[in-house]
Swiss-Prot record:
GO biological process per UniProt: trehalose biosynthetic process
Catalytic activity line of the entry: alpha,alpha-trehalose 6-phosphate + H2O = alpha,alpha-trehalose + phosphate
Keyword entries, A-Z: Hydrolase, Magnesium, Metal-binding
Family of the protein in this entry: Belongs to the trehalose phosphatase family.
Binding-site residues, Mg(2+): 150, 152, 333
Residues the entry annotates as binding substrate: 150-152
Listed Pfam families: Trehalose_PPase (PF02358)
Upper lineage: Bacteria, Bacillati, Actinomycetota, Actinomycetes, Mycobacteriales
Protein's organism: Mycobacterium ulcerans (strain Agy99)
PANTHER family given in the database record: TREHALOSE 6-PHOSPHATE PHOSPHATASE
Protein's recorded name: Trehalose-phosphate phosphatase
InterPro entries, per the entry: HAD-like_sf, HAD-SF_hydro_IIB, HAD_sf, OTSB-like, Trehalose_PPase
Amino acid sequence: MSVTIDPRRHDAVLFDTALNSTQALVRQLQQARVGTATFASGGGGHDAAIQALIESADRVGARPGRCVVITADAASVAAARDSGFALVIGVDQAGHRDALPDHGADTVLADLDEVRVRAGDRHMSELPDALQALGRPDGLTVPRPAVFFDFDGTLSEIVDDPDAATPTAGAVAALQQLAAQCPVAILSGRDLADVSQRVGLPGIWYAGSHGFELTAPDGTHHQNEAAAAAIPVLEQAAAQLRDRLGSIPGVMVEHKRFGVATHYRNAARNRVGKIAAVVRAAGQRDGLRVTTGREVIELHPDIDWDKGKTLRWVIDHLPDQRAAPLVPIYLGDDITDEDAFDAVGPNGVAIMVRHNEDGDRATAALFALESPARVAEFTGRLASQLSTLG
């Protein structure tokens, strides 16, 4: 069994000083521009273990929600889990393999040779501008595209209250122009009914809950039946999270049909670790998958399905590809959009909508846009370009 450290999701790795043979992995991480730091495990109790981890993350300038902890110490595993670290890897150096997952390890390895490091991605600041590249022979030219958009942070600005989000000025008109030229789809983490109502444009694809539920341009409804079995579990998890987190100012627990999103954008920064820890514990208890995003942590059915697989499913169900295959273009801003960036493949186009909430993180995207307003402008220009091609 192996585990992958992904620079798109992880800014730093914290190593227990008691671990053996860390040098080779440290070199791989440095080559991938992932920070590294150490902490001493053992002694001092639970609060001291948490403090040691937080101080180690601070030294490398990373927040716990984007840090990996690797340790052979069960107490350090528990401390990392309770303080909201993104990934907790246990290493069985002393024959106590069962104790590590019992304390909250995401995975347990025999040694560090089983750790992989994703390589080859660029950072957001290094990407060329998609608007400047559009239509240039050496830039971005796609004569037969199918264009996919995230909603929040891509077609809409990120706002403090998710219920207040609306498409940015000109976005819906540009989408309508584009839909007259090629297939268009909105892939959102929101409920299907929510995102389709906010955009309000007929004749395009809508996918809600990261693709667990879709409607086609003709109104045909599709859902992941395996995911539907988890709906009662998600309802129960939402109620329990409201009980556990509802008293924390600035936290909002949103129950969706195929997910539970805990928003903490308006919460105090020193409460975020606890919030994440509570959600991760709920996911582990209820057998649900945990995903993260911009100031949100979510629970989903534990099924191998994401925006990338949704994109490929939609492509496979689009008509009129006999003359030439459609080329996917995907525009998104968040970690969950990286699955779609991967899925467009070497012939597709992935476009990141830049932000600074995760620093200058790595991404699989090929191009970037500066804001949702630029997304609307790009969409309109792409529609005009396609109309001239006939």
